Regions:
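Sec/SRP-type N-terminal targeting helices
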Residues: 18-22, 35, 74-101, 114-140, ...
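Amphipathic alpha-helical coiled-coil segments
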Residues: 19-34, 144-167, 178, 185, ...
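Short helix-capping/hinge motifs at transmembrane helix termini and TM-loop junctions
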Residues: 190, 230, 399, 439-440
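Bacterial Sec-pathway N-terminal export signals of envelope proteins
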Residues: 1-64, 112-125, 129-131, 233-273, ...
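Small/polar, glycine/serine/threonine/aspartate-rich low-complexity segments that form flexible
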Residues: 46-112, 239-248, 279-280, 284, ...
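Periplasmic alpha-helical coiled-coil/stalk elements that build and connect Gram-negative outer-membrane
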Residues: 132, 138-257, 367, 412-413, ...
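Metallo-beta-lactamase
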Residues: 214, 263, 423
Length: 448
């Protein structure tokens, strides 16, 4: 399995990653709640009352039915409708006054904020805050995914390192077995000394013990990876290291891509939006209240009267201006300064994150370039050690070299081969680290 395949299974099965998706959904529902603030609000009331007229002391029965419906528009204006029915029945009344009297009123009113609340600043900022909450949840989720991916890189590379040591030890065992078999055949002819056989056997037993210890380490690492991937504990695991280590972009392009992916940069963007939101709200709070209110309606009045019944109706309407001012603005000024300081801090952190990203990318690229050079050197070292061992084996077969030297040369070749493999693995680690910085790993690994 490649690193991407391992990470995909970890992502699909890791419990805490599912929790981050729940957090994002909760934040998204906040946007729905904010949007509902523009919905219609319905209020109604009904009541009866027996009282005494404050003017003439006449017992009076009153029935009242009232209903109104209103909503705030996205512009900040408020539209409302009202309907009202009143029935008044007094024990006595003046001539000409209807008794009982029934009055009705239906109307519409419209409130237009001219300063504080204009453009519905509060709602707009609440909407932005909801969007910011979603962005924050997504940034937190991205950060968790990157942390898991970084942990999987370490686990995968550690497992690959153990695997490389196992393969290297197996090759060394095969060479020791060939040398032992050769010396046993020579001993059968009486031309090999006992010390040669003892030396080769000792080397072989040492390699076999080393392989046993490495196999124990591999089993523990395999179980750990299988647990993360949600696989059976005893499931077989074959690792396949990436062979394509090409970069293909310059540092500036990489920095731009890393900036777009960076969870830290996303969090700072969220903080900037929060600061801007707080600034707008603080500025709006400092404004005077100046509202223009229109109303229009239709009223009727009817009832029994002497000498004739009453039935009147009239179209009514009006306009008024409402004004209000806070006399102590120090609290609003403090809020405004806090928002400005919050934004300044976010800007400074943004500069630091960009600087860290640039240095991280430059550092990884330098490590990759140095790693490529080191890998090339190790490849040449392996070729030299192999040639040296081949020449020593030929001399050994002609009796011109001893067993000590052959064992030494085999150990040196095994060390060179292991160093080459380990350097290749470390180079792979740097490549995966760079791909994670750039966010490229998530183009292959799918996230729900």
């Amino acid at each position: 399995m490649t690193y991407e395949q391992v990470l995909q299974q970890v992502v699909d099965n890791y419990p805490s990653l599912q929790t981050t998706a729940i957090a994002v959904e909760r934040a998204r529902l906040e946007s729905v709640r904010v949007e509902s603030q523009l919905g219609w609000q319905l209020n109604a009331k009904a009541g009866v009352q027996h009282d005494m007229s404050s003017t003439f002391g006449t017992p009076t029965d009153t029935l009242n039915l009232n209903g109104n419906m209103s909503r705030m528009l996205e512009s900040g204006d408020t539209l409302g409708f009202v309907a009202d029915i009143n029935r008044l029945d007094a024990d006595s009344s003046f001539p000409g006054a209807p008794n009982p009297a029934l009055s009705t009123n239906v109307g519409v009113n419209y409130r237009m904020p001219l300063q504080k609340g204009a453009d519905n600043t509060s709602f707009v900022q609440n909407r932005l805050q909801a969007e910011v909450a979603v962005a924050q949840a997504n940034a937190d989720r991205r950060n968790v995914y990157d942390q898991i991916a970084a942990q999987v890189i370490d686990l995968y590379i550690n497992a690959a390192t153990i695997n490389a040591r196992i393969e290297n030890t197996r090759l060394a065992i095969q060479r020791s077995q060939r040398l032992l078999k050769y010396n046993q055949s020579r001993a059968g002819l009486g031309i090999a000394e006992d010390k040669d056989l003892l030396q080769v056997r000792a080397q072989l037993r040492s390699r076999e013990a080393e392989l046993t210890a490495l196999d124990m380490q591999w089993q523990a690492q395999r179980i750990n990876l299988n647990r993360l991937m949600g696989r059976d504990v005893d499931a077989d695991l074959q690792l396949q290291r990436a062979t394509d280590i090409s970069i293909g972009k310059n540092t500036d392009d990489m920095l731009q891509q890393a900036t777009q992916h960076s969870p830290a940069m996303a969090v700072i963007d969220v903080r900037m939006k929060q600061a801007d939101t707080a600034l707008e709200l603080s500025r709006d709070k400092r404004k005077d209240k100046l509202d223009l209110v229109f109303n229009a309606g239709y009223k009727t009045l009817s009832g029994d009267s002497t000498p004739s019944d009453v039935s009147e109706n009239e179209v009514v309407g009006g306009v008024q201006i409402e004004f209000g001012r806070g006399l102590d603005l120090s609290g609003y000024d403090a809020e405004l300064q806090q928002a400005q300081l919050l934004r300044s801090a976010a800007l400074q952190d943004q500069k630091q994150v960009l600087l860290d990203l640039r240095y991280n990318i430059a550092g990884v690229l330098a490590e990759i370039n140095a790693g490529n050079a080191a890998l090339s050197a190790y490849e040449k070292s392996v070729a030299s050690e192999q040639a040296k061992l081949n020449e020593a084996e030929q001399r050994y077969r002609r009796g011109r070299s001893d067993t000590d030297q052959l064992i030494q040369f085999e150990a040196q070749l095994a060390t060179a081969e292991l160093n080459q493999d380990l350097q290749s693995i470390e180079l792979t680690r740097r490549i995966h680290k760079l791909q994670l910085l750039l966010g490229n790993v998530w183009k292959t690994v799918k996230v729900e």
